[in-house]
């Protein structure tokens, strides 16, 4: 790791504090983030972005975890192209985080089951929809159509995505002058940090 700049180190540490709050506080602006993957096909290659809920953050391993329906496109997209991006924005503090990561599906059944058992019932209901995401319907889907007794749903379509952070691009908007910096990450911390023109 390079010799750290005290100001950059403070920013880096503050990023992890806010991300942790985002994972544990529902009303924190970082609780939701834009998660982008690459859709690869013979016809075209294009990005796909959706909002996901930040579920867990680990500064020691430089990872972020979100939950997913195993039938969603992002699961197959990550398997084909694991490099993903995440965008967070705090409107009050005017802080934007753009994160580049390497994402993968968690393979540990024990961890998946434990996370499922700890989830709230209202969250579990999302995984009892009888159709995969993006399925065409004749009318809007109703929660009354949930198949709560179907053993092939619920836990069987519930998955975890763990993303290993590779880069963090920090931007603080300020009328006296925007502040932007980047952190390149490896193993347990940043190896390069530098100021960037906003």
Regions found by a protein language model. Name each.
Residues 1-198:
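Binding-site signature for planar aromatic cofactors or substrates
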């Amino acid at each position: 790791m390079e010799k750290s700049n005290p100001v950059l180190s403070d920013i880096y540490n503050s990023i992890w504090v806010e991300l942790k709050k985002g994972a544990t506080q529902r009303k924190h602006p970082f609780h939701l983030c834009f998660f982008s993957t690459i859709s690869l096909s013979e016809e075209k290659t294009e990005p796909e972005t959706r909002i996901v809920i930040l579920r867990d953050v680990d500064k020691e391993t430089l990872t972020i975890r979100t939950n997913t329906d195993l039938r969603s496109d992002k699961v197959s997209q990550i398997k084909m192209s694991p490099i993903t991006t995440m965008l967070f924005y705090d409107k009050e503090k005017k802080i934007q985080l753009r994160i580049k990561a390497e994402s993968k599906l968690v393979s540990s059944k024990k961890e998946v089951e434990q996370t499922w058992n700890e989830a709230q019932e209202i969250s579990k209901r999302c995984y009892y929809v009888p159709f995969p995401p993006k399925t065409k319907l004749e009318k809007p889907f109703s929660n009354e159509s949930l198949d709560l007794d179907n053993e092939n749903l619920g836990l069987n379509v519930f998955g975890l995505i763990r993303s290993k952070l590779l880069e963090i691009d920090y931007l603080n908007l300020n009328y006296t002058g925007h502040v932007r910096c980047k952190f390149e990450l490896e193993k347990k911390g940043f190896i390069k940090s530098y100021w960037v023109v906003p």
